[in-house]
Structures are given as structure tokens and as C-alpha cells.
């Protein structure tokens, strides 16, 4: 498919997840409706990850595409009808007998994802070492956490140009090269092993490089170690605490077999969230989630949340923006050359600010323009004028004077306060 065809095919899929409930706003949101170019709901302004939008099939397609053309193709399967790669995530079902008075009932626990290891006991141990609220048990808080992190850590628009908004043919080409590069140089999937197994792998790898002369010495050294020494010789790369013998550890092939992590420590170095499904990006001695690895390589537009591949873009308020996306967060008018106010780290045009966000003057009860001087005390505001900032009793101007605040009123003296409050 040529670049022109790819560009024409692009779309944000506005029908996807339409009407899905917001997990954050609950009934306050009428249901998910995707903004034309922002990755947020038009109704409540929350992100896609805050809504119950993605189905398991859509998640598996996204991760399947991420693993396409990588060494992790064993984790995907291609659909016969359209050839789309699907992520073969490992679902683990544990059946635990529960004793009852007369008979034994069966308690079945389904994990929506589990480490793809042959030893189910090891996978069970891994899960138990995660915080309970982050264990992806079907229908639980942990399953919802995993779903949210899939959306947050691995945005589809960080790997698929067709999920982006109006890229030029040149930007499509640059993005494809960028994705190919990070798949080859940074993308990885963690593996769960016992620390001793990792040492064997590392020793085998060293033997390939240094010949057989070191083999007998290495084996002899391992045999001489007591159980206590074995338990203390491994430490977590993140928290530096010792690994307990018999506990599973996570390793990342790109980091090397000499580095281990506790299951709960296998997190992104930027957001400190568990790396969803142990999918990591390795750079300069650090683990990243997909989002924050990409952020370390490319500027990200604070408006549309996409990576910026254009040479020209705007920097404002410590953030980056596509030229066409530096817009009012409320009405989407372009803000280049206009007065704007930052509200919760989002730029808002002057009219929208006055209408929806401005402080109200206690004197005249009108909105206070962002460029006008004002007096603020606790949660009360006044225009800094002779007409508004007055004694609530005698109307004396209080600008530059001492005053006594009482429940939204201000007084020039104790006498005026007594008169008004009596």
C-alpha cells in the first residue's frame, strides 16, 4: 500500500466505544463520544483509558500489531480471514477446592493475563507477589487496572499511523521508521524464572564467549555456595533488596541476564506503574513503558496526545503542540497570537475562561477578566478597583488599606464590623 493510500485510509474510529460509560465520572458522563482529534471524550473530557471502551479483541489486536515483525511473533497468531495479528495472551484458570460442611465446592479464579510459563506454580507465585489491587483477576479492580494500563502505556497511535490524525505522507514514513527502530532496539517482554535458572543462562552465555575453560570452575563455584549464600547473592535491580530463594524473578533479555526484578518492581522508570503484561522498552539502563519510551525519543502533542514528526511545532507552558492543535481546551479555537489562560495545565481562550472558569467578584458579582488586577483572600475575590473592593458597611475603598474579612465580607474597622454583624 503506497503512502497516499495509507493517508486516505486514516481515521480515528469515532464509532469505537461510542456510549461507553466513564469509570471516573460515572453517571455525570452521558457516555463516551470521541473528540474529533483529541483522544478524549467530548462529554466529560476524560481520556479513553478512563472509559470502558476497549474490548479484549481490540486490545489483542493492538498488542498483536506491536509484536508483528519482531522476535516475539510466537506471542501472536494471524486471523485467517484478514491476516491481522492477534496477541495470544496467556489466560490462567486456577481451580481451588473449598471445603464446605457437606461437600467440597470448587472456587475457580481466572486471570485475564499470566506469565506464559510452563510451570503454573511459578505463575501463581508471580501473581501473589503483585499488589492485590493489581492482580488481573477477571471482573476485579486488578483486571480494570490492567485494561487501563494497556490503553495508557501502549497507545495505538504510537505504533500505527492509521490511528493518527491527518499525518502527511512524509510524517507517515518517519513514523514507520521510528516504530521499526524501537521494535529492533528497545521492545522486549519480560520472562519469569527462578534466580538460579537465570544464573545458569548467564553462565551458558559467558561460556559461549570465553570457551569451555571456565565451565568447570563456574560449576564448582556454584556447588560450593550454601543455601544462605544463594539466597543473598541476587538483588533486585530496582529496590536493591535481596531476592528470596524460591521466589520468582523477572528478567529482561535486553537488560542482560545479570539483572533481576521482583515482580512488583518490574515498573516503568517514569510513571512507576507495573509494565503491563511485562512489555517493556529498554534504554540507557532503564525500563520504560511504551508511552514514556516514546516520550524520551520524540515530542508529544499535549493536544492530540500523538508523537510529533513534523519539524515545526509549538512549545508553550513547558509542553509541545502541533501547530494546528494549540487550541482552547473548551471550544477548540486556535490560540496562536491570542490571550489564553492555563486551567489544570490546559490552555483556555479568554472568552471561555471568563464564561466557565473565572473567579467571581464579591463586590459586583461579575466574572473577573484574567488580565484585570484582583484582590484574593482565601476563596474570595474582588476586582482591585474603588468600585468593588470596599468596606461592606461604610463603602470605604480598601485598596492598600488594612481590612477585616468575615464570611465573604470585608470591613475597614471593628466599628463597621459590629454595625454590620449586630
From Swiss-Prot:
The lineage of its organism: Eukaryota, Metazoa, Chordata, Craniata, Vertebrata. SUPFAM superfamilies: Glucocorticoid receptor-like (DNA-binding domain). Residues 198-224 are annotated as: Disordered. GO terms for biological process: negative regulation of cell population proliferation. GO terms for cellular component: cytoplasm; cytosol; focal adhesion; plasma membrane; protein-containing complex. The gene is TES. Its main location: cytoplasm. Keywords: Cell junction, Cytoplasm, LIM domain, Metal-binding, Repeat, Zinc. It is found in: Cytoplasm; Cell junction, Focal adhesion. CDD domains: LIM1_Testin, LIM2_Testin, LIM3_Testin, PET_testin. Residues 205-217 have a biased composition (Polar residues). It comes from Gallus gallus (Chicken). Pfam families: LIM, PET. Gene3D superfamilies: Cysteine Rich Protein. Scaffold protein that may play a role in cell adhesion, cell spreading and in the reorganization of the actin cytoskeleton. May play a role in the regulation of cell proliferation. May inhibit cell growth. InterPro entries: LIM1_Testin, LIM2_Testin, LIM3_Testin, PET_domain, PET_testin, Pk/Esn/Tes, Znf_LIM. Residues 92-199 form the PET domain. This is Testin. GO terms for molecular function: zinc ion binding. Belongs to the prickle / espinas / testin family. Residues 234-297, 299-359, 362-422 form the LIM zinc-binding domain.
